[in-house]
């Protein structure tokens, strides 16, 4: 499994071995739960800053691509920070990251209720299949009885003897 924060800054090379950039963002299809490709910073006088999953030749510590093109669709940065709202209208977190599998399917969103909350209680994991994307928010339809968490590191916990 990958998190977007682990994919950012991966170096991208063309098939001749020339470095063409680094991953800055991902292009997503929210309703199909897919990563469509990766976004790089735009170069001077060039609008090409995207490569699709199909254009990837090698994916590992670096990425080698066949070609780059222009992308105008939804990016993760467009929804990062959106409020996640439950069916009662209560804000239950803000989107911070995505969890993606090795086939580039988006499995879940990672959200947090705030800076201090994430250090004390951890982050929440929201399944994408239980959500609806709005213009400024995400409606989460999941059950409140089931909570998935990413627990904080043992900063304040006692060490086992």
What residue spans do the PLM features occupy?
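Peripheral interaction segments used for macromolecular assembly
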Residues: 1-161
């Amino acid at each position: 499994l990958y998190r977007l924060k682990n994919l950012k800054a991966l170096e991208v090379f063309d098939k001749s071995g020339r470095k063409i950039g680094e991953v800055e963002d991902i292009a997503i299809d929210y309703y199909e739960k897919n990563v469509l490709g990766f976004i790089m910073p735009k170069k001077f006088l060039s609008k090409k800053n995207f490569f699709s999953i199909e254009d990837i030749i090698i994916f590992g510590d670096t990425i080698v691509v066949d070609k780059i093109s222009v992308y105008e669709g939804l990016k993760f940065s467009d929804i990062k920070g959106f409020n996640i709202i439950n069916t009662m209208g209560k804000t239950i977190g803000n989107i911070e990251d995505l969890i993606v599998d090795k086939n580039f399917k988006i499995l879940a969103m990672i959200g947090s209720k705030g800076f201090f909350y994430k250090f004390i209680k951890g982050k929440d994991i929201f399944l994408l299949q239980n959500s609806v994307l709005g213009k400024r928010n995400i409606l989460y339809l999941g059950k409140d009885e089931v909570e998935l968490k990413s627990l904080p590191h043992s900063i304040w916990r006692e060490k086992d003897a």
